[in-house]
Amino acid sequence: MSTQDENDRREYYRIEDTIALDFTPLAGADALASDELHEASPLFNLLSELHVMDFESQHLLRNISERDRTLASYLKVVNKRIDLLGQAIAQSLLRDIGPPKHVTLSEGGISFFNAQPLPVDAHLALKMVLMPQALGLLLRARVLHCQEHEGQFEIGAEFEALTDAQRQLLARHILQRQAQERRQAREELT
């Protein structure tokens, strides 16, 4: 194992997950840009924006909650309704993206299997829907390694140019999955 791989493993907590995943190779100026990506699908962009807006408004909801509990309760109900709409959008998107894939996910990157090899240092646009929150993310990534494994290719990619909101949403998803894994492990012991 290289020093870079060891450093990657120490820097972020990794989880095993099953997500909807699609990717597109980026070339030319798109590959080198650090701008946030936008999907051609308006539904995917809407889903992604819903979660970013939810994340960015959490501190406002906490402030309102300190001053007016009734208003905060109402806003939480409205937020749940919006979440349900987001889940309906995600179900539609899941049909378009394809069957869920088993991945290893961290704040720093992703590892997944693919039928075709990808060149090391290739730049990708990764379209992911993380469940059960139906969190849609479109992220830039660079292929770190591609290794053949039982007729498939294990692709390891590092996320690039994440916004703070994207990084926080990924971290929250990973923490929730980690907590879920711990609960399941405790239940299996009892």
Task: Tell where the protein language model's regions lie, with residue ranges.
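Structured alpha-helical
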Residues: 1-190
